[in-house]
Amino acid sequence: PMVNQVHQLSYSPLTAHAFNADRSKVAVSPNSSEICIFASTPQGWVLEHSLTGHDKVVTGLDWAPNTNRIVSCSQDRNAYVWTLSGATWKPTLVLLRLHRGATSVRWSPREDKFAVASSARIISVCSFEEDNDWWVAKHIKRPLRSTVTSIDWHPNNVLLAAGCADFHARVFSAYIKGVDTKPPPSVWGERLPFGTVCGEFPTPSAGWVHGVAFSPSGDALAFVGHDASLTIVYPSASQDSLPTMHVIRLPSLPYVSVMFISESALVAAGHDCQPMVFEGSAENGWRITRSL
């Protein structure tokens, strides 16, 4: 069995973290405007780089496994794309055109776009324009009615799930002409212009949505809410029939994050200080199986 290792990286809360492709390095934000990159050594985790560019608390980090680029977002309403050149991380400022702080950021599966959630009731979807040599942000606004707390990309590089403090999880199209190829039809729909709402699902008792995740196939969506609920949605391929939804009311404090580890298993964690494993399917429902 794998032995748990505990490492103290900071004496302050970590507001964001992201591992590189082989998990040999981790970027963290110690509740400040700084990004610290630690490398794994036989002696433990050693500080390798300190990245400065933001002027308020960094709220989101993601490390692209193939291009090795880091994207960061902050309460300062901006994002940076960090590229390793020799032994130096070089930042590129991305103007998100937000009037409130960013909350989360994620690279798309093909790493040619990233999405930034915010307190401005906006998701900024950013893509690179070769002609102008800069990152351009397009906004998803409606029907978001509050802070967007979490986002997750569909494997097809086009659909984007968002959890919001307006008690809903939604699936949007983030299709950008000239960047994306037309995705094949899926259970979420066929014609998907930018900003299309492909699904909208409430928490059972009006709880903020804290975390969203697509399954590996992208055919299921899970989200956790502040009403101590976990919901798994299987959309219907037919527009005439309703999606299958499995709602688990938890006898515990709320979860704040969720991720699938296979089509039939997911892990959720939150204020109970222990990750929990759930297993199930569309046909048989879902249940808690064990604690990690």
Where are each of the predicted segments found?
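Structural hallmark of WD40 beta-propellers
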Residues: R23-A27, T67-V71, Y80-V81, P91, ...
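Intrinsically disordered, low-complexity acidic/Ser/Thr/Pro-rich linker and tail segments
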Residues: P1-C36, P183-V197, L292
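Conserved strand-to-loop turn within each blade of WD40 beta-propeller repeats
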Residues: S29-S32, C73-D76, A117-A120, G163-D166, ...
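Canonical WD40 repeat/beta-propeller blade segments in eukaryotic WD-repeat proteins
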Residues: Y11-F19, K56-W63, H99-W107, R145-W153, ...
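Terminal intrinsically disordered, low-complexity extensions flanking WD-repeat/beta-propeller proteins
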Residues: T147, K177-E200, P243-L292
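WD40-repeat beta-propellers
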Residues: I35-S40, A79-L84, I123-F128, A169-A174, ...
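Short C-terminal beta-strands that terminate individual repeats in beta-propeller domains
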Residues: N4-L9, L47-G53, C73, P91-R97, ...
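Solenoidal tandem-repeat scaffolds enriched in leucines and small polar residues
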Residues: L95-P185, F194, G211
